[in-house]
Amino acid sequence: YGSDHQSFAYRYNTDNHGKGSWYSINGNVDYQRTSKKNKERMITFSYKINSHPQTNDSYNTYLNIEPEADRQDIIDNLLLKNFHSDGKTNTMEQTFQVDFTTPIGKLHTIETGAKYIFRRNSSDNKFYEAEGGSEDYVYTDDRSSEYRHLNHIISAYAGYTLKYKGLTFKPGFRYEQTVQRVKYIVGPGEDFNANFSDLVPSVSLGIKLGKTQNLRGGYNMRIWRPGI
């Protein structure tokens, strides 16, 4: 602008707007069967599904580019480009599990089980560009991306519980095998596969000190896996 705020070299307006959505879908089914001879002996079958789809649709637009006579030069020199981004992501997980518990005598309990988890992370982001002031959007490969990340997780666990007077002792372990598949459909990045396993020990100890007093301690470990 000039000193009188009336003359100017160039000017333009920008408009940024968009909309998005986020959902959480969860469900589970359990079936449990108890032994007629011993009510503490039971087997449980479980299924669980979780899904978290998200969308994002945004625009950045240049408007009222002036002076009109120099409009194209302004667009070229300042690299003014409208863009439209249309993105979708989702993390979906299905879990199948079976658990078995049985007492051995009055003091001992054995727990064992197995689990299969199928986890699918996906991201699809389409990017479009148009010359400033134009709505002729063209899909741009260089700035778009599409990505898939699959995990197949198989695990088994075993645990033992000893209850004697005011003492409760629970050691156990869990073994997990993960098969990972990553694929870049659009955008930079190389597809890769990975397999790895983990052995996770756990232990807890509880002591009853009185009618309202308990002392507890333990060790456990959780495994965190990448999402989107």
What do these predicted ranges mean?
Residues 1-228:
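Primarily recognizes Gram-negative and organellar outer-membrane beta-barrels
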